[in-house]
Every structure is written in C-alpha cells, then in structure tokens.
Amino acid sequence: EINIGDWSSDVCSSDLQDPTAYGEDWGKPGSICELLDKLNKVPGLEWIRIMYAYPERITDDFIAAMKRNEKVVPYLDLPIQHCNDTILKNMNRRSNRAELLEVIGKLRREIPGITLRTTLIAGFPGETEEQFEDLCNFVKEVKFDRLGCFAYSAEENTVAAKMDGQIDQETKDRRAELVMQIQTGIMAQKQAEKVGQTVHVLCDGIDEESGLYLCRTTGDAPEVDGNVCVSSEEPLYPGQFYDVLVEDSDLYDLYGTVVK
C-alpha cells in the first residue's frame, strides 16, 4: 500500500505476493531493501505498507530497511498458517516454531510498536488435539495484534486434499472458533489500552449512515483491519492525515475526535 496525498494504491501485484522476494526473479534477492530506500525519497509519499512477508525471508537487512525509512509503516502480515513443526512440514512451510518465535521477537525488539497480523488454519489433515493445543498456546504466547483463523478447506487436486487424516467439518469449525475466542480476548485488551492515546490517522472517507469519518492508523491495513471512527464538526478529507484522541473502542474499531 502506498499513500501519496489523496491517492492510495495497493502496489502488491499478483506476481509479488511476497514483497520480500522482490528481485529474486532477476537474480538480486534482497532488492526490497533498495526499493524501500528509493520509495522513501519520493516527494509527497506518506506511507509505505508492506502487506505480506514470509518469516523465512525476514532478514536483518530487511528489518534495518524498515527501521531507517520513516515512511515505511511499522506493520507486517506474516502468513504463518500454523506453529506446530509437524503440521508446518506437512504444509510444506519453510519455518518451524522456534524460528517463528525468533523472528517475531526480533521484529518487536527492533521495531517497537510494530503491528503484527497473521492468518492461521485449524483442522489441517492429520492435526491432532495435541497439535491443535500447541496452536492455541502459541496464539496466547505471541498475542498477535491482528489474527484470523479459518477452518481448513480442501481444494481439488492439491496434495493436502489427498492426505490421510482428513478431519470432519464440525471439528474443524470448532477448532477455528476456539482460536478466534482466544484472539478475541487478546484484541479486546489491546484495543482498550489505546483509549486515551492520540493516534495519527489517514482519512479514507465518511460513513454516510453514521456520519463518522473512517480513518486508519499505521496499524490498520485497508479492507482487512479496523477503522478509527472519527466525529468532527469540521470536514475531513480523504487522503489527508489527522491526529485523533481515542475516546472509546470495541473489538475492531476505535472511536475518537480530532485533536485541534
């Protein structure tokens, strides 16, 4: 996501689903760091958001590039899917549990206040109750800022669809719901902690029904995360930035007024 004035665009194209792999197609892995350095110098550009980053590609150089370029917002979506080593191997993922914890810890140490989002899958073929419990404990330990969990759904002609140990739909749904219940408690606490803070937001527009302006912080990606719902007697303009005092919260959204 790139924001320049009143213009915003998702620049992560289908051939760049993992921005951290930028440059590998022409034999220059790690070129994302150089790209961020160049984008950071573009006049008028306010925010650069890296939407997806696979943990195994998050290097020290990549973290350093995020830190030194002030226009790169402290936000990453880490599509980890699971944490149990056996399940990760069966998913053909490259990271294991220890490596996931290491990269998450490093990101939080090096970039204080970074927002971390992830998506998990419950009920992958062969997932035992013990492995699912491992996933639940991982969610409790890491306390992601944003998290979605979905029941595994078999796709035709995939390796996973042909695996032994397919799990019934009721069990898959129950497991996904349990993960989201854990995350609900984490989210409620994180949201409540923001009340009383002043946050810098980008205005996306107005909700005609409520009359509230829909804005986002650096921790809110478009379409997938929540809003900062702002009441203002003066008009707010899409693409412009404002400071907002957070006065209330719910599970996904914050509510506040513009600081004058």
Say what each PLM segment does.
Residues 1-11:
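Single conserved hydrophobic/aromatic residue that forms the stacking wall/gate
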Residues 9-10, 46, 145, 150, ...:
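Short acidic/polar active-site loop segments enriched in Thr and Asp
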